[in-house]
Design a protein with these regions (language model features):
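Active-site-proximal structural scaffolding
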Residues: 16, 46, 63, 67, ...
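Carbohydrate-binding/catalytic loop surfaces
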Residues: 40-52, 92-97, 101, 105, ...
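Non-catalytic C-terminal accessory modules of carbohydrate-active enzymes
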Residues: 282-420
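Structural helix-adjacent loops and short alpha-helical linkers that scaffold large soluble proteins
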Residues: 16, 58-71, 102-122, 129-130, ...
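Substrate-binding groove/exosite segments of carbohydrate-active enzymes
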Residues: 1-127, 132, 136-139, 248, ...
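Repeat-solenoid scaffold signature
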Residues: 256-295
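The feature captures the catalytic groove of carbohydrate-active enzymes
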Residues: 77-93, 126-193, 197-265, 269
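Hydrophobic, well-ordered secondary-structure elements that form the walls
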Residues: 23, 107, 232, 268, ...
Length: 420
């Protein structure tokens, strides 16, 4: 589709500039009537791929119409007879994408239109819970999680799936409130709270200082994977001490099964950014996406394992040339740089209020534009100066500085030690 590149990013690091440009090109190639997964092989709409496309879109095109078309397409018609794309986790991403869209766009009318289909989709999910109120793979379900280079057990109750399920119930409660469904709000809040209360007793392992991967017949497995742990961090489902424990025992621990898809690197690096590790994430972005560029990539791939060489990079699904070399989920630096380096995100729907918390992450300077429903937010930052310009809404700027900063407009207020 013809798209206007409303968002942009530039910095002193030319490799990172190239990563942003190739990410934007990858997104554009995979934007048609809908946000599709890859431009050559599947050309299909998958909910897990799509939610990342939406989030990247909010920092690049701000194309709301393509978001709405894709969300409607993925839902389909009633009665519900399977999960979204038959994949359990993809159903949960579908719920989450609706409220994300509302927060960025402010479009309540769309939520009102979609809410009855959200209810019937959630009824389908609730009808497939076990005696613990949790979800397990049933006949006809694809429990996906990720394309992993190691063994991922899909048996029993996966901690990752329960966390997504819990967030989906919370999302249903928020959407129920938006449409004035008081009974629905109460119902979904109660279900979400009950499930959330079970997460730590069921899956947290004090010895491993992490969520275990799954429970089978009420028994924790020995396996720890990154998935549930990183989602629990940026969903803020754990206290600060446990989040910091996860950072060391899982996210920065090379002995834990590594993620080799940009799909899940998206969430892994988001969790690290949420924990203030932008310097480390910058190195990872340059190594991982820069690694693809060094292999000759002109768009970003479905999967990249730096340990592979030559034509191994082209193989997937048991086929020597099976890999998609232009895959939307490969473009996640667009989102990470907009939200966690320029530091821009909506606080109230449609950017009526927004937060700006820029972090250089090892750069000397950076600047960029983040689109909003009726304008833009422009951010420039170096080690001594910050400039922010917004065309709409009320903004809250947060910076870290040992000394009180000087402002041309307004008076900085101290939030905590070194934070203004």
């Amino acid at each position: 589709l013809p798209e206007e590149y409303r968002g942009n990013f530039r910095c002193n690091d030319e490799e990172l500039n190239r990563i942003w440009e190739v990410g934007a090109y990858t997104m554009h190639l995979t934007t048609r009537e809908f946000f599709i997964d890859g431009i050559k092989r599947d050309r299909w709409v998958w909910s897990g791929d799509a939610i990342q496309s939406y989030l990247m879109n909010y920092y690049l095109f701000f194309d709301n119409e393509s978001v709405k078309r894709t969300i409607w397409l993925l839902r389909g018609k009633d009665p519900v007879t399977s999960h979204s794309n038959t994949i359990m986790d993809y159903t949960f991403y579908w719920f989450l994408s609706v409220y994300d869209y509302y927060m960025y766009s402010g479009d309540r009318h769309f939520v009102n239109q979609l809410y009855p289909r959200m209810q019937t989709m959630m009824d389908y999910v609730l009808g497939r819970t076990n005696k613990n109120g949790m979800v397990e793979g049933m006949t006809g379900d694809w429990v996906f999680v990720d394309w992993a280079d190691g063994y991922l057990d899909k048996k029993g109750e996966l901690s990752f799936e329960q966390i997504l399920f819990c967030r989906s119930l919370e999302t249903m409660a928020l959407c129920a409130e938006l449409v004035g469904d008081a009974n629905g709000k109460q119902k979904y809040e109660k279900l979400a709270a009950a499930l959330k209360a079970k997460l730590e007793p069921a899956f947290w392992n004090n010895q491993k200082q992490a969520f275990v991967h799954n429970c089978v017949n009420g028994q924790q497995s020995d396996a720890v994977t990154r998935y549930a742990n990183m989602f629990s961090v940026f969903f803020q489902y754990l206290n600060e001490d446990k989040q910091q424990a996860i950072k060391q025992s899982v996210l920065l621990n090379d002995s834990i099964l590594k993620i080799t898809t940009p799909y899940m690197r998206f969430y892994e690096l988001e969790a690290l950014c949420a924990l203030g590790e932008q310097d480390a994430v910058m190195k990872e972005m340059k190594a991982y996406w820069g690694g693809m560029l060094k292999e000759g990539a002109t768009s970003f791939w479905e999967k990249y394992n730096p340990e592979e060489t030559g034509t191994q990079h082209l193989a997937m699904y048991g086929r020597p040339y099976g890999k998609s070399l232009c895959h939307a989920w490969g473009a996640s630096p667009i989102y990470l740089l907009g939200k966690y380096y320029l530091g821009v995100k909506p606080v109230k729907e449609g950017y009526k209020e927004f937060a700006i918390a820029p972090v250089l992450g090892g750069l000397k300077w950076m600047e960029g534009t983040v689109p909003t429903p009726n304008g833009n937010i422009h951010v420039y930052m170096n080690s001594k100066t910050m400039k922010v310009k917004a065309t709409e809404g009320k903004g809250y700027l947060t910076i870290k500085s040992r000394r009180p900063p000087k402002a041309n407009i307004g008076t900085p207020e101290k939030v905590s030690e070194g934070v203004w």
